[in-house]
Every structure is written in structure tokens, then in C-alpha cells.
Regions:
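Alpha-helical, largely C-terminal catalytic domains
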Residues: 1-212
Length: 212
């Protein structure tokens, strides 16, 4: 094979349905440029949503033994899919952001996320588009054990980062202790023993001034 042939870019139009899959995957690259309120533990920069989704999925694997009956494969799928909509809607809601406690703001943002889900997942060919959208809706509805588990882990992750970086996003956004407890006490339904530990650490963070 000549060097000219070996260096020729792949013509994705020859892939048929793969073309749509590749287009979707390239669209996902934008998640690496969606930055969240939490910074990395070394505080060099804010974490991006792609990093959050990866850490979230690994956390779902790590905590699974403490949640009997949870379907880990499905929980991981929910973790990886749930924030893809931030490509269009952005990230303005996490446990370090005052808007996470504003119900009116949350409703408005949710409408944008629904639009984003429909656009982004329909980049995929059928039936994958339907499957991905169903996963996103399942996470959002918080009715299955897997979606409840995923939501609990998702709420815990920003909290854990704050507890290990001097409450960075809490301090920057003037978050109150009771706000975090109220928003995250849902964790106790899925991981009650872990929530007891977190509550103790939240009280310590409050005493240190990381939470108002």
C-alpha cells in the first residue's frame, strides 16, 4: 500500500449507519469544554463534565456492593448518559451552585435539557437514539432503583470534592449548610450509612466556615 493511500482520511460516508454514530461521538467531544463549578482537588482549574461523568461512573461501580439488587450495568449507563445534555444546556446546577436550590430556575433549565436530549440523542441511528433517550428519561424520572442510585451518587460527588478542597465551590457561591443537607439528604434512602458519615463531615465543614 502506498503512503498516499495509507494516509488518506477515512470516508465516513462509506460507513452507513456508522456515520451517525461517529457524528454523535464527535459531538460528545464538546463535553470536555463544559466546565462545572467544582475545581479539581489541586485547584488548577474547574473540572469539566466529561471528567465528572467518568468519575461518576467509576463511583457507581465502587458503591454498588452497598446497594443490594442494583443493576450495575444499567446504573453505569445512566451515569454516562445523564449529563450529555449539557453540551447544549450547559452546567449551572450542581451541589456547589446556588441555582441548584432555586426551583424556578431548575424548571427553566430542565426545559432546555429536554430539548437538548432530543437533539443530541437523535444524532444516533435507530434504535440507539430511542435507547439513549430512554436512559436519560429514566435517570430524570428517579423511579427505578438504578436511577435512584445514580441520582444519589451524582449528588454525592460535588459534595465529596468540596469536602476535600476546603469547600471551594461552596465558599465561592455562598452556600449554606442547611441547603446542602436539604438537597442531598436523599442519599440516605440509598446509602444510609454513607449519608451518616457525610452529615458528620458537613457539620465539620460548617464549623470550619466552608459552609455558611
Amino acid at each position: 500500500m502506498s503512503s498516499a493511500t495509507s494516509n488518506k482520511p477515512l470516508d465516513v460516508l462509506n460507513f452507513g449507519a456508522f456515520t451517525e454514530v461517529v457524528q454523535f461521538l464527535m459531538e460528545l467531544d464538546k463535553l470536555k469544554s463544559v466546565y462545572r463549578k467544582n475545581k479539581l482537588l489541586n485547584r488548577e482549574r474547574h473540572e469539566n463534565t466529561a471528567e465528572h461523568s467518568w468519575q461518576f461512573a467509576v463511583a457507581a461501580m465502587a458503591f454498588a456492593p452497598y446497594v443490594p439488587g442494583v443493576n450495575l450495568e444499567r446504573a453505569i449507563k445512566l451515569a454516562l448518559v445523564h449529563d450529555i445534555v449539557e453540551i447544549d444546556a450547559g452546567d449551572v446546577l450542581d451541589a456547589g451552585d446556588v441555582l441548584v436550590f432555586d426551583n424556578a430556575a431548575r424548571e427553566a433549565i430542565h426545559d432546555e435539557e429536554v430539548k437538548a436530549a432530543n437533539r443530541l440523542f437523535n444524532l444516533l441511528p435507530s434504535p440507539q437514539n430511542t435507547e439513549f433517550l430512554a436512559l436519560w428519561n429514566e435517570y430524570d424520572a428517579v423511579e427505578t432503583l438504578e436511577s435512584k442510585y445514580a441520582n444519589a451518587i451524582d449528588r454525592a460527588m460535588p459534595m465529596l470534592l468540596n469536602l476535600h478542597n476546603q469547600g471551594q465551590s461552596w465558599v465561592e457561591n455562598h452556600i449554606r449548610h442547611e441547603q446542602v443537607v436539604s438537597k442531598c439528604d436523599y442519599i440516605q434512602e440509598i446509602l444510609p450509612e454513607f449519608w451518616l458519615q457525610l452529615k458528620q463531615q458537613l457539620e465539620q465543614a460548617h464549623q470550619k466556615g466552608w459552609l455558611l
